[in-house]
Amino acid sequence: MSKFYKVLLASVLLMPSVVYAAEEGKETEREAASLTANIKRIAVQYNQNSVTNKEEDAEYPGTYTSDEQSVFTGIFDGNLEYNNATLVWLNSLFMEYGHSETQQNGEKTKSENADKILLTTDYTHKIWKLEEGIVGPFVNLGYQTEFTKFKADDGKKYRTKIVRGKAGMKLYEGKYFKELYAAAVEEADYTYGAANMKTAGEIGYQFEYQIRDDMKFVSDGFFRKYFIYDKYRNTDFKFEAETNNRLDVAIVGGLSFAPFVNYKVAKTRGAKKRRSDTTVGLSLGYQTDYKFF
């Protein structure tokens, strides 16, 4: 295990004691503390995707090889949030899946347009309270996998298995930018068996703008650039970027209707050209929260 992961794992394991220490002896902060279960989004969306340079390079994994068809996709995005005057601790789960099936000459072909499971725990320490939001260091540890296996260029099937650690600085709880961060990233990729260690840099954001009472623009995204690899694998990304944008229109309660446009682009080590995937569609979603205290 690299020094980065030892430090990151120690930070994550110490989170409960840090939370307790922050609470101990601070009655006013304890009263202001909250524990909330956030269902950020449960949605079913109908979408059409378009992949560029699909026929020119084979060295791309997963949904970058999907067919250009209309499909239904299911999404779940939720977290458990502990928040007080000095820290924010999030434990999150994100899942999405969508696929299409076609039959030609008696042969059925399946194409995945979305397949992702992401578990993360994230600790942010609040240091500076600015007009634009709260700024402080953060650590994040996550595990990314998928529901079904994909077929690689060697003819075998594999399932994405990535442990990803991040450490950096974050702007949190801003008026528009709910999250804006820059971080160093260390990955342990177990997709093809033995760990393939990778080092990268990443910037990302979450943005919200309330257009009117019943309408809100929501956007999130990231850019990740890899610098160091432990092994060579032609499907390893050199860089990866993604932005997801939707216009939430409230219907009733937590139910909303949203047109959306998502775009992701990447280039692998074995490809000559970068490949992009654009998805447009409509979604029906639900969001709510429950405060324990």
Question: What feature does the model see in each segment?
Answer:
Residues 24-36, 81-90, 126-136, 172-180, ...:
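Short loop/turn motifs that connect adjacent beta-strands in outer-membrane beta-barrel proteins
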Residues 236-293:
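Predominantly the C-terminal beta-signal and adjacent terminal strand-loop region
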Residues 101-202:
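Outer-membrane pore/translocation modules
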Residues 41-52, 84, 95-101, 141-149, ...:
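Transmembrane beta-strands of outer-membrane beta-barrel pores
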Residues 74-82, 119-125, 143, 165-173, ...:
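Residues on the lipid-exposed face of transmembrane beta-strands in outer-membrane beta-barrel proteins
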Residues 33-44, 89-93, 119, 133-141, ...:
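Transmembrane beta-strands of outer-membrane beta-barrel proteins
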Residues 177-250:
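Outer-membrane beta-barrel transmembrane domain signature
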Residues 47-73, 103-109:
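Surface-exposed strand-loop-strand hairpins of Gram-negative outer-membrane beta-barrel proteins
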